[in-house]
Amino acid sequence: MGLFESNLPKHIAVIMDGNGRWATSRGKSRSEGHREGAQAIDRLMDASLELGLKNISLYAFSTENWKRPVTEIRSIFSLLIEFIETRLDTIHKRGIRILHSGSRKKLTRGVLDKIDFAVDKTQKNKNLTVNFCLNYGSRDELLRAAQELFLERKRSKVALEKPLKEKEFEKFLYTSILPPVDLLIRTAGEQRLSNFLLWQSAYAELYFTDTLWPEFDKNSLVDSLKWYETRTRKFGGLTNG
């Protein structure tokens, strides 16, 4: 495949778009589309392990998604609970670590308990980290981080006007233990970031595919990695020569 471990992105972020369109095009309900999208997450985890990827962040539910119909929201969270209940043992045995990025506000006690259990059970796993961004919005994250930094400086009696360094700020991000995003994939043809990991994706390569999320498979992932290999990453500088 021409993929070498040294060239693999250390952190891939995925905007999983197209569940609804997949369902509508087949005369199915949006809930059925989300269920099929959960199968695509399984395929992504399998392929990531096989290819040697280490960190994946998935945009599962945004802070803006609360505007959707109540029935659809209930279906999404019901699927999340089912996903954890039916797959967690296998995920754990395969050495996959689960993380959660996002606000805990608005999430029910039942959902939080399932997430916390999955995070706690898999915390020592090292083969692959899958970060579920649930009730996540990048602006919300940055505001929360700024507030926590302010409170921390106040508690520590550090002068508030002291110049702020990136590393100090990043400690308060949900993704503080993850490397920056190298590759951001968005499915279903849309070409926008939708308030997803804006700080973390500052120098990410952006890969847009028309493939709907329920149809995303190992070949789709390999295509994105081959494309990533062709990119010259400058990080604001110049290429040699």
From Swiss-Prot:
CDD domains: Cis_IPPS. Coiled coil: none annotated. Keywords: Magnesium, Metal-binding, Transferase. Pfam families: Prenyltransf (PF01255). Substrate binds at residues 18-22, 30, 34, 62-64, 66, 68, 186, 192-194. Mg(2+) binds at D17, E205. Its EC number is 2.5.1.-. SUPFAM superfamilies: Undecaprenyl diphosphate synthase. One of its GO terms (molecular function) is magnesium ion binding. InterPro entries: UPP_synth-like (IPR001441), UPP_synth-like_CS (IPR018520), UPP_synth-like_sf (IPR036424). Its cofactor is Mg(2+). The keyword Metal-binding applies. PROSITE patterns: UPP_SYNTHASE. One of its GO terms (biological process) is polyprenol biosynthetic process. Homodimer. HAMAP family: ISPT. Belongs to the UPP synthase family. Catalyzes the condensation of isopentenyl diphosphate (IPP) with allylic pyrophosphates generating different type of terpenoids. This is Isoprenyl transferase. The lineage of its organism: Bacteria, Pseudomonadati, Spirochaetota, Spirochaetia, Leptospirales.
